[in-house]
């Protein structure tokens, strides 16, 4: 995964009020990932309300207030669709759901009060797209939920949300991702969604 993919996800959560931590600064290529290396981002919502409901499986910006804390896996396979066959044949998609990874993730967050006031640790998968045709779409969703994924976000949904929030008269010099999007939007190089 390239830094730009993770940068898009980071910007999306930050633009929606989350504190974001990048779990590691390097990419694992020539060996099997250790537990802590399966997590791409760790997100925390400081404005989460204690009595909030559980977020829907499809996360859009309107659902983010219901997320308290989460680990995020980014699968930026932009030319692929997460079909049932692809999901069954790609166990690396679910690597961040292993017990050793979840144990490591719980160590990264502050302790939840004994009264259970903290929200559950969600497992969020960022993916390019799901099949649009039935029964493949439903089968993909069933596989993702059965594996233990709590929510998914598509790159398309994130990019649309970011583009809607970008002002062309602002200078986003602290974010290469937002600055490039602003420039493209300023010169009408992006189609309206």
Residue locations for each model-derived region?
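Intrinsically disordered, low-complexity Ser/Thr/Pro/Gly-rich regulatory segments
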Residues: 1-38, 43-193
């Amino acid at each position: 995964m390239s830094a730009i993919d993770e940068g898009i996800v980071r910007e999306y959560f930050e633009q929606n009020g989350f504190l974001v931590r990048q779990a590691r600064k390097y990419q694992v290529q020539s060996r099997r990932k250790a537990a802590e290396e399966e997590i791409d981002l760790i997100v925390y919502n400081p404005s989460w309300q204690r009595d909030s409901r559980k977020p829907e499986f499809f996360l859009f910006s309107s659902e983010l207030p219901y997320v308290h804390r989460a680990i995020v896996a980014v699968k930026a396979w932009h030319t692929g669709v997460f079909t049932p066959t692809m999901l069954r044949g790609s166990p690396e998609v679910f690597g961040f759901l292993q017990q050793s990874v979840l144990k490591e993730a719980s160590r990264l967050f502050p302790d939840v009060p004994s009264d259970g006031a903290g929200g559950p640790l969600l497992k969020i998968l960022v993916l390019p797209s799901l099949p649009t045709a039935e029964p493949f779409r439903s089968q993909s969703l069933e596989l993702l939920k059965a594996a233990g994924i709590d929510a998914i976000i598509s790159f398309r949904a994130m990019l649309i949300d970011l583009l809607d929030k970008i002002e062309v008269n602002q200078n986003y010099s602290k974010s290469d991702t937002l600055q490039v999007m602003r420039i493209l939007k300023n010169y009408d190089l992006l189609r309206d969604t």
